[in-house]
């Protein structure tokens, strides 16, 4: 006997489907039914329908009669209601498919119905919402947009999975429009698309120069379209608006999966062995949303101008030529979408001498205002204005004015509202802040110290810095601007509460943990406070007039110094089985290799950046995560601290092992000899004394390490949205909130929000911040660079409470603090470091 399905298709009769349906009917009313009764009812149904061809509806009618005849009235009622509900769902599905009238729409809706069977995600609900947006005469695109909007607006704290349904609908709409565009262009394969994009100057020619057509075709087979279902609506919407390749008329020509594959092709193109194998591994880690690369890498890999790095750090020299060179460096970096950290601690203070003339110097503020204007003038690829953090030491004579750069009161000629101030603190400052706020604090000019004492105070740290600082304080030849620690603390906290800044850089903690202290010092961090690498200023050597080819040219020679570059990626811990050590090591090994490849494949906006990046081969592997909530761990708990300690130790072990293996294959970074990696001090300082760690230390000493710096936790504000996770190390601001985008309110839901995870998501502003600080201290032991850690405060906080958090952070060994986020304060996120 054959059965005609509702679609019109014919299939062979299967009695198991009938008995299965009856079992479900009995189970739904908690009623038992023995096999004999089931067999009897099945026989009754089969006698009634006889041989030949029957419809599904005919058979289901007979099942109802058999249940009633057997006296199973409750089960029969449940079965009837089930049929009615299924009928309503079919009607809703057909209504929606008919309104859109696109091939594949009904299959998409069937998939949604299958994957989201819960009552709150019924297609009848979607159809009801959609009917409110439906208008006569809508075309296909308009109807799909209305359907997406309906799903978005159904997203609530109680029904969060609508954001995944909305994403599927958005992707369907996008792929329909893309298919029309590709058809018009005659593009029928991935290779055709790469050829077309390359010809239009949208794709780097180097991809097709490195891979044969056969390799491109094989790589195209790696694409898994079903991984689009991992996107939330917010993530996919952001991906399509900002990251996939678009024509000059802003028409997208690349799918998210093709974007991931294009990045993988770029990052693997110089691999000598198993190149396509690495393409696949890079593609898999990205498309499974286990790893996110930094925004510049996601945006620019595979493109002609492949600037892949996030942030840059420059040491501003104390000379007119050097200051303007640093400002020009910032302009060049900003032009290609990078953010900047600028250390102004060497620049002479207001009233200092110039060429022996006392009182001639105007101080750092006027130069910082030039940085501010450059940030506004040189926007990031026309998308947003440039961004720079400027760092100044806590003992610099211009510090009080510096701390008022962004505040709302005072002389506007001394303001720079578009840059982000940051202060570099020695241990002595926090020790005095803890013990006696009325202690004197002496502010001095670095140029005056260098002139009188013959050394730069900022070139030292720890006990040696403190000894020299007191030596300067006691030297009557050096002028001082003496205030109390309380005066500085008051200015810092006032600015922090009003503006979220200054950022905090604990210079002694940073430099004590620097594995490359044998080669220099770390003066400051970057725009997002997660990078800590050796720095030194660019120096002018000579300027000569020479003749070349009959032309007179001016040749300026410079010594490149150490111009820091950040190459970032993040592990999405909520999407990774972190308890599986083998899996974690393999994944970390893959992303470390990808980041190391970035160094060689990068387009550098400045030669200084290229020189430093290839000298140290520094990378910054970080995390973004909803790992704790997913595992049922409360933020404010010792379990949190213990779990973070274990996980970050394993990540660190995996990263070091991977980098050392790369060194065995490709060689160590240039400055390995004499480093803490080579001497073993890196492991001793962190108390890594288990047999496993001792073995790894021995391996590193023997075969080297590829990357001078390995771990740095960036804020990941944008890329965390792509991967549907929480940003960086932060707790959630709210479990559910509405965000306005282009006049539309978009719902945002905490990742994997459910009754099981609900109570593990606590609003960042009501969390006891001491737990966040302590957790940061626990993680810091395993992170050789720093972490973008925010403090969240409310209007109820007193200044003394905020100060206690700063002091606690210093006591816990926290290297940097990013924003102080007041509940009423909006701060600007760094897009570049969104890894």
Predicted regions span which residues?
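Alpha-helix capping and helix-loop boundary segments enriched in small/acidic/polar residues
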Residues: 6-13, 100, 251-254, 273, ...
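Function-dense linear segments that define catalytic or interfacial modules
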Residues: 245, 251, 263-275, 279, ...
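Internal maturation/activation junctions in enzymes
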Residues: 285, 303, 587-608, 633-716, ...
């Amino acid at each position: 006997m054959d059965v005609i399905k509702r679609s019109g298709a014919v299939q062979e009769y299967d009695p198991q489907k009938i008995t299965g349906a009856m079992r479900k009917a009995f189970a739904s009313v908690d009623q038992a039914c023995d096999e004999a009764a089931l067999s009897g009812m099945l026989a009754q149904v089969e006698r009634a329908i006889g041989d030949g061809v029957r419809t599904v509806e005919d058979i289901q009618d007979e099942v109802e009669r058999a249940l009633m005849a057997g006296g199973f009235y409750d089960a029969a009622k449940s079965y009837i209601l089930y049929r009615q509900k299924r009928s309503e769902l079919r009607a809703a599905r057909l209504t929606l498919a008919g309104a859109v009238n696109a091939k594949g729409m009904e299959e998409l809706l069937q998939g949604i119905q299958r994957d989201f069977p819960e009552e709150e995600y019924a297609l009848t609900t979607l159809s009801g919402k959609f009917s409110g947006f439906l208008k006569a005469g809508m075309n296909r695109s308009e109807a799909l947009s209305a359907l997406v909007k309906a799903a978005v607006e159904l997203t609530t704290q109680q029904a969060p999975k609508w954001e995944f349904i909305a994403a599927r609908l958005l992707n369907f709409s996008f792929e329909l429009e893309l298919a029309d565009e590709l058809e018009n262009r005659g593009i029928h394969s991935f290779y055709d698309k790469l050829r077309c994009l390359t010809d239009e100057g949208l794709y780097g020619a180097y991809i097709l120069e490195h891979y044969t057509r056969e390799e491109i075709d094989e790589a195209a087979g790696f694409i898994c379209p079903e991984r689009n279902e991992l996107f939330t609506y917010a993530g996919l919407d952001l991906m399509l608006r900002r990251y996939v390749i678009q024509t000059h008329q802003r028409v997208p020509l690349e799918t998210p999966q093709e974007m991931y594959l294009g990045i993988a092709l770029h990052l693997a193109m110089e691999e000598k062995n198993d190149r396509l194998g690495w393409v696949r591994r890079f593609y898999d880690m990205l498309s499974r949303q286990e790893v996110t690369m930094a925004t510049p890498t996601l945006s620019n890999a595979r493109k002609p101008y492949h600037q892949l790095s996030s942030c840059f750090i420059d040491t501003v020299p104390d000379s007119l030529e050097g200051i303007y060179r640093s400002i020009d460096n910032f302009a060049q970096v900003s032009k290609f979408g990078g953010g900047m950290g600028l250390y102004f601690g060497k620049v002479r203070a207001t009233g200092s001498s110039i060429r022996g003339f006392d009182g001639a110097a105007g101080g750092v503020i006027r130069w910082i205002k030039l940085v501010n204007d450059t940030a506004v003038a040189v926007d990031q690829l026309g998308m947003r204005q440039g961004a720079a953090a400027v760092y100044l030491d806590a003992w610099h004579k211009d510090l009080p004015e510096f701390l008022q750069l962004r505040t709302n009161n005072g002389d506007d000629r001394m303001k720079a509202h578009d840059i982000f101030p940051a202060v570099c603190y020695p241990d002595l400052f926090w020790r005095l802040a803890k013990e006696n706020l009325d202690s004197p604090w002496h502010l001095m000019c670095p140029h005056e110290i260098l002139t009188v004492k013959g050394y730069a105070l900022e070139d030292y740290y720890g006990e040696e810095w403190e000894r020299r600082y007191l030596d300067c304080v006691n030297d009557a030849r050096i002028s001082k601007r003496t205030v109390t620690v309380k005066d500085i603390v008051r200015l810092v906290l006032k600015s922090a509460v009003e503006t979220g800044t200054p950022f905090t850089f604990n210079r002694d903690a940073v430099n004590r943990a620097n594995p490359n202290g044998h080669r220099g010092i770390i003066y400051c961090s970057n725009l997002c406070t997660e990078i800590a690498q050796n720095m030194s200023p660019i120096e002018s050597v000579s300027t000569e007039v020479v003749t070349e080819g009959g032309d007179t040219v001016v040749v300026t020679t410079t010594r490149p110094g150490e111009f820091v570059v950040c190459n970032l990626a993040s592990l999405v811990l909520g999407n990774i089985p972190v308890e599986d050590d083998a899996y974690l090591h393999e994944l970390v090994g893959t992303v470390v290799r990808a980041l190391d490849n970035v160094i060689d494949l990068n387009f550098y906006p400045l030669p200084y950046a290229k020189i430093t990046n290839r000298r140290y081969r520094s990378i910054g592997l970080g995390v973004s995560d909803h790992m704790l909530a997913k595992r049922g761990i409360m933020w404010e708990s010792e379990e949190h601290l213990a779990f973070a300690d274990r996980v970050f130790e394993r990540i660190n072990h995996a990263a070091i092992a991977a980098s050392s293996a790369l060194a065995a294959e490709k060689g160590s970074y240039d400055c390995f000899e004499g480093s803490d990696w080579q001497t073993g001090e890196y492991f001793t300082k962190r108390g890594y004394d288990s047999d496993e760690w001792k073995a790894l230390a021995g391996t590193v000493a023997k075969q080297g390490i590829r990357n001078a710096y390995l771990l740095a936790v960036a804020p990941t504000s944008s890329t965390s949205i792509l991967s549907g996770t929480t940003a960086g190390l932060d707790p959630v601001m709210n479990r559910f909130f509405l965000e306005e985008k282009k006049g539309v309110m978009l719902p945002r839901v905490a990742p994997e929000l459910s009754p099981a995870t609900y109570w593990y998501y606590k609003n960042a502003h009501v969390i006891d911040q001491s737990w966040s600080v302590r957790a940061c201290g626990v993680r810091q032991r395993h992170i050789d660079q720093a972490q973008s850690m925010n403090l969240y405060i409310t209007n109820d906080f007193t200044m003394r409470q905020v100060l206690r958090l700063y002091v606690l952070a210093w006591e816990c060994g926290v290297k940097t603090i990013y924003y102080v986020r007041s509940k009423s304060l909006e701060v600007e996120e760094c897009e570049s470091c969104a890894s």
